[in-house]
Amino acid sequence: MPVFHTKTIEGILEPVAQQVSRLVILHEEAEDGNAVLDLTLPVGAVSRAVDNLIKVGYDTCHSSDDRILQADMPPALQRVEASSRLLEDACHMLRADPYSSVARKKLIEGARGILQGTSALLLSFDESEVRKIIRGCRKVLDYLAVAEVIESMDDLAQFVKDISPWLTRVSRNIDAREKELTHQVHREILLRCMDTVKTLSPIMICAMKIFIQITEESQRGQQEAAENRNYLAQRMTDEMNEIIRVLQLTTYDEDEWDSDNVTVMRKALSAAQSLLTSALDWLADSRGRAGATGEKAIRRIVDYSERIAARALPEDARLIRATVSDITSMTDSLCELRNQGGDSQGLASGCANRLKELVGTKEISGILPSALTNTQRTGGTHPAHTVTGRLEQALRWMDNPGVDDNGLGLQAVKAMTSEAGNLQPIYSHLQNVRKFVDLCVEIDRQADQLADLEHRGLGNPPAAHAIRNQLRNKLRELVDIMKKVITDRVVEDFADISTPLKQFVDAVYASPTIVNRELSFEEKAHNLDDHSSRCANTALLVAKCGPCKNKKTVEAIIEAANQVNAMTPQVIKAGKIRLHNDSDSANLHFDNLRREYSDVLNRLRSHVDDAIDTSDFIRASEQAMRQYTVYCENAIRNNEPQQMVDNTSQIARFGNRVLMTAKNEADNSEEPSFVHRVNNAARRLHSAIPPMVNQAKQVALNPRHGGNAQSWRDANEHLLSAVRQVGDAITGAGGSRPPSQNLLVESVPPKAPTSPIVHDRIYIREDIPTPPRPPPPVEISPPPRPPPPPETDDEEETRAFWERYPLLGASSQPILSAAHNLHQELRQWSSHENEIVAAAKRMAILMARLSQLVRGEGGTKKDLVDCAKAIADSSEEVTRLAVQLARQCTVIKMRMTLLQVCERIPTIATQLKILSTVKATMLGSQATIGPYGQPIDGSEEDEEAMQQLVLNAQNLMQSVKDTVRAAEAASIKIRTNSGLRLRWIRKPMWSNF
């Protein structure tokens, strides 16, 4: 079936699909009794192109040493050649008889074969190119596997000489491949992994060198050096394996992160079923080689089965994993036997039977389909990955009392209170801990009470609505508390990420003559480990419980936190090596790991800063500074100079963090007034920190000196005011800040009357009594709010359309369900003066119509082709508007996010047109259409085409949903003089009913 994971394949298939779609329409018109036009010229052009393609294909086969390519490409070439002959025969027959039914059948079969054969041909060649890259990757892996046995400098020199050319070749190939891929996520993974390999390779070689030196010179630290080397080699191995995995991917699921269990399982089952035929064909062919398409199909079925097992019920998961284990071991043995030339048919037959038992056939129900059915019966949904997402799920449950969400809303509430319980140990406001715990208990109680009422069919009475209102308020209160706790923790733990490392470095490089040198090293190593652990744990809390909903940011936080945890012991071991070995190699080795650790920690802090609200962070920083101000006052009162120094140092660190945040905000914006305002506030803050520190030093020298203490208080208050001004500059609240309620009002004695003052012959007497105070104005009620803009005809048509396609009917139809999900996202916005929302709503309706057409529920093949083309046109409109909005957005990160999510849409829409053309060539060739559009008694090809079409439609709807969300966020930060007008009017809830 067509695949589109490279730009080259997509560029070749699109014009072919356009020609095939014309032939499909001609075929359908002929079925209505019309004569088919003379096709001699277009068919002749196709034949010449096919002849040239076949010649190039066979030349490639003969010149290649890839035996898998030599086995896979000829069948595709033969199909293209046979399909071309069918077109030629149809052309000749139609010229003799324009109404010939046999000729029309040959025409459609030839068109279908040309498209699918060309796709198979391109995929076969592309897989051969991927295997070339993977061979280089495996060569690097082979060298990494022997890194542990290199024990001499000569061996190391040879190792570097051998591995360097392969690393260069792999890097060059990955850079070229990345530019070819159409899936953005795959491109990013390849680049990230390759960059990591480039960074780690010199560090690993240096680690190998220091290990050899320590071993040869019998110095201390041999075990630490070996662990450093093994860690780096393993990390490089993991990155290379990830590169190999991504290189072999041809599809990407855009919304798997947000999908419920049933949706993910259904997609995985569909993918596994589409691979079964290829796997069984390879098992039946005794000449099938390891690494061929069929063997890879088995491996992918195993991967999809693991994905299903991870979401299935426990008993189903155990059965799936046991079957997968059997299939994996049998496949490994089969590959080994075939490579040795032994008799493998018995083993292949057994493996085929196990595969059928796992995936299912028309005769066998299958373990995976049964697991999906059982999960559907129990609900199969899972809460979102973040607290913010879970809050949305819970509110959706409460806002739709008549809709059965299979317990998802209740699960989301329980997950929120469970995460809140994890925050309890770090809840700093001890006097409020009891209140925090009671709030969680009350939320659980009310959620259970509401679920019980709905279970008994009492979800709509006033009592249930009262519980909903209370539960909504309590959930929002809980989320606010969690957000504050996490922000406070971020402020505290990330205030200074450099000092623990700097102190550890000083301990590592301490002179051997210093007393208690090793004791100091152990202390600083423990401090570094504790600091890293706190940073990583806090970051993981931000990822799970923080306000960020961005998948990319959350995953980046988790990855960086895990790297910090893994690298910390390696840095300590490298420091221990340097402590006992004062050599250039030991210095270089330690510096390499220290810099890598520092980079990862800074990257983690950057991701955490992106995940929390800037204004909340600055307010929390100011509050923390005030708390440490209290500690300083206690130090002054108790005559504790060291405490004064420590606490003022922490205040200065908080101030510097706010300063760094302000600079980041200014760098992230292109709005001149905002940048000017923030930079001015940052300059005032920058100038306020040194005076506070200097005055604190004077207090530390003489805590009893009242003048010094007052000078410090004034400087500290000035610093706190500067921090507050930075927050006001970022939020834009400075101009509207209410006057201070703590002003000191002095009583001024009345003055004696003075002589008149003349101003341009007007006499003003200061002793003239003031006129009486006028009566208060009569209270006038404010004018009524203007009514919302009237619903347009488009809005009425949209509502009427979706009333005919309710959510309950969409649950068993994946394409309609994807369209419905987009509609649910868009129904909150009015399309009045918002072209992005209007175009996205059209896309949702068109996708629902496409679902009807591919299921054979009315319409013609021409309707299917035209519907796909209309979806592609609307996709271009959404992309154009999103790009236009992004260009006017003044916040760089928002702009990049919007551009990244909308750039996927045209590619997916083009793929949809091609897949719809493939489906159009198959419509009418089956007697019955199943619940997911699959043929009950049709070809395996049609089923595979349907699965790809479903996945493509789901990806397109998810990308449009992401684009609308990013556009709404970016709309509040557009240039005021841009002339761009996008109104985001949130529709009242009653308008959706």
From Swiss-Prot:
Q: Which Pfam families match?
A: Vinculin
Q: Which keywords describe this protein according to UniProt?
A: Actin-binding, Cell adhesion, Cell junction, Cell membrane, Cytoplasm, Cytoskeleton, Membrane, Repeat
Specify residue ranges for compositional bias: Basic and acidic residues: 758-768
Task: Write out the ranges of the repeats annotated as sequence.
Answer: 258-364, 373-480
- Region (Disordered), start-end ranges: 730-797
An example of a Gene Ontology BP annotation on this entry? cell adhesion
Annotated compartments: Cytoplasm, Cytoskeleton; Cell junction, Adherens junction; Cell membrane; Cell junction
Region of interest: 2 X repeats: 258-480
> For bias kind Pro residues, which ranges apply?
769-790
Its membrane topology, per UniProt?
Peripheral membrane protein
Q: Name one GO molecular function term.
A: actin filament binding
Give the InterPro entries listed for this entry: Alpha-catenin/vinculin-like_sf, Vinculin, Vinculin/catenin
Annotated transmembrane regions? none
**A GO cellular component entry from the record:** cytoskeleton
Q: Would you identify the family this protein belongs to, as annotated?
A: Belongs to the vinculin/alpha-catenin family.
Q: What does this protein do?
A: Involved in cell adhesion. May be involved in the attachment of the actin-based microfilaments to the plasma membrane.
Subunit relationships? Exhibits self-association properties.
- Protein name in UniProt: Vinculin
